[in-house]
Amino acid sequence: MATQISKKRKFVADGVFYAELNEVLTRELAEDGYSGVEVRVTPMRTEIIIRATRTQNVLGEKGRRIRELTSLVQKRFKFPVDSVELYAEKVNNRGLCAIAQAESLRYKLLGGLAVRRACYGVLRFVMESGAKGCEVIVSGKLRAARAKSMKFKDGYMVSSGQPTKEYIDAAVRHVLLRQGVLGIKVKIMLDWDPTGKSGPKTPLPDVVIIHAPKDDVVYSAPAQAAAPVTLVQEAPLTTVDYPEMIPPVA
């Protein structure tokens, strides 16, 4: 028998479940280009779609790894048997995914690449992928003993209002180096896409679209109208005109 739960508790429970699931998958699939998760609840089962840049590594050999993740999620969150399914979806354009770029920058720094070179490489790749703007912030003990932050920007970036929720994709990651922990923040501003595939459908509120003027339409002269026909009303017949119409006197 299903237990009754208030709407407020339901929203909180769903948020906690999503946050914990996202944390587990972030730690487990960090090296496989994990870029987010989507949860779809149907009457029959719960579908969990994992977005990653390397889906083959997420699936594993003959689907072994995805089955292990399914068993882990099922036991951790107490799902009934065969009521949860995990799927792997490939990210179409990883240059427009902030999570994928933050993970890429993280592994570049772990590999010993200089901070400036790594950040400029990420900026260039994001802008070549069709983004409208990009911002990368790296903070921590970069060179000297004193911590500082370095900001790298390119293109156009909005920072307030409703467009930040629709156009900005942001991600934060941390990397542990020999000198300490560095913080990485990547913000990508997507471009407007009427189809909704590579960007939001709604245009920016300050965008003005000037339509091209229409061509002047040349109207031809109307055809010559025929002369109007005048109707002449005849006078009524009288006995003066026709005497035979006079009735005989009895």
UniProtKB/Swiss-Prot annotation:
Keywords from UniProt, A to Z, are: Ribonucleoprotein, Ribosomal protein, RNA-binding
Which CDD domains does the entry mention?
KH-II_40S_S3
GO cellular component terms, semicolon-separated: chloroplast; cytosolic ribosome; cytosolic small ribosomal subunit; peroxisome; plant-type vacuole; plasmodesma
One GO MF annotation is:
structural constituent of ribosome
Gene3D superfamilies hit by this protein: 3.30.300.20, Ribosomal protein S3, C-terminal domain (3.30.1140.32)
Q: Which residues form the KH type-2 domain?
A: 21-92
Q: One Pfam family this chain carries?
A: Ribosomal_S3_C
* Domain of life (superkingdom): Eukaryota
Q: Name one GO biological process term.
A: translation
What assembly does the database describe for this protein?
Interacts with SNRNP35.
Q: Which NCBIfam families match?
A: PRK04191.1, uS3_euk_arch
- Stated family: Belongs to the universal ribosomal protein uS3 family.
Listed name of the protein:
Small ribosomal subunit protein uS3z
Organism the protein comes from: Arabidopsis thaliana (Mouse-ear cress)
Biological classification of the source: Eukaryota, Viridiplantae, Streptophyta, Embryophyta, Tracheophyta
